[in-house]
Regions:
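Bacterial N-terminal signal peptides that target proteins for export
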Residues: 1-12
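Extended soluble regions of mature proteins
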Residues: 25-250
């Protein structure tokens, strides 16, 4: 059961990963999104509904993504490092770039990888709508997930806009690294390059063990301003731990 919940957490992380980043200037960019996840009951255990704010800071060669108040991910291209920070446990994992899973994954995680297969498909539609101030195009994402003989299909409806002055290559650079943190998502980076623009609204549903989980994520704002001191640094007093993508918590 814990592995199934951990998998859903990974998928949620994946969904939250699509903070796309605007063009660079002297100041950094601060991006805010809101995410709602419906309540779900799996094997008699109920996960309550959750509302949380996600935020991303991005500079020229570094970024920080916060998922609520419990977890942060820092990418430092200047140091060739990624840090995964757990604020509840006060721990962090350090990963060298480029990522080599043969070196960093524990044996248990490698065994889990062998039991999983994840295949994404992105389809652009002709549907358009204006969301807030942004003209958007609808994309459909179908994800086929196989784990230990179980099929756990996932569907995403993504409304994407080119109205926000996005540097797509910069976006791909950072989100590619975030997706690569999860070895089962290794095929996602190329497939999601089919999307031309910035995800303004994402609706996600996933089937797992007879239950359906739904979430909604929407862009709130994009600002250009100086990041507070220490934004891209590790917090003091945290303990270093081994990285295991199947045990990441939100």
């Amino acid at each position: 059961m814990k592995k199934k919940i951990a998998l859903w957490s990974l998928i949620s992380i994946f969904a939250l990963t699509f903070f796309i980043f605007p063009k660079q200037g002297k100041a950094d960019y601060f991006i805010k999104k809101l995410r709602h996840t419906d309540a779900v009951t799996i094997m008699g255990q109920t996960q309550p509904a959750k509302d949380e704010e996600g935020s991303t800071w991005m500079g020229k060669d570094r970024m920080r993504q916060d998922e609520g108040t419990n977890k942060s991910t820092i990418v430092r291209f200047d140091l060739q490092k990624i840090y995964i920070i757990d604020h509840v446990q006060k721990t962090y994992s350090e990963i060298d770039l480029p990522i080599d899973f043969e070196k960093i994954l524990p044996d248990q995680a490698k065994q889990m990888m062998q039991m999983m297969k994840v295949t994404p498909k992105v389809t652009k539609t002709e549907e358009t709508q204006k969301i807030k101030d942004w003209n958007c195009v609808k994309y459909l994402v179908d994800i086929d997930m196989q784990m230990m003989g179980m099929n756990m299909p996932m569907k995403m409806e993504m409304w994407v806009s080119k109205d926000i002055g996005i540097d797509i290559k910069l976006y791909e650079k950072f989100t590619g690294q975030l997706l690569s943190l999860q070895p089962m998502f290794k095929d996602f980076t190329e497939e999601f390059k089919k999307m031309d623009g910035y995800p303004v609204l994402t609706l996600t549903s996933m089937e797992m063990m007879g239950s359906q989980t739904k979430s909604r994520e929407e862009l709130v704002s994009v600002e250009k301003k100086d990041a507070p001191a220490g934004t891209y640094d590790l917090p003091e007093g945290y303990t270093k731990t081994e990285y295991n993508p199947f045990e990441q918590k939100r």
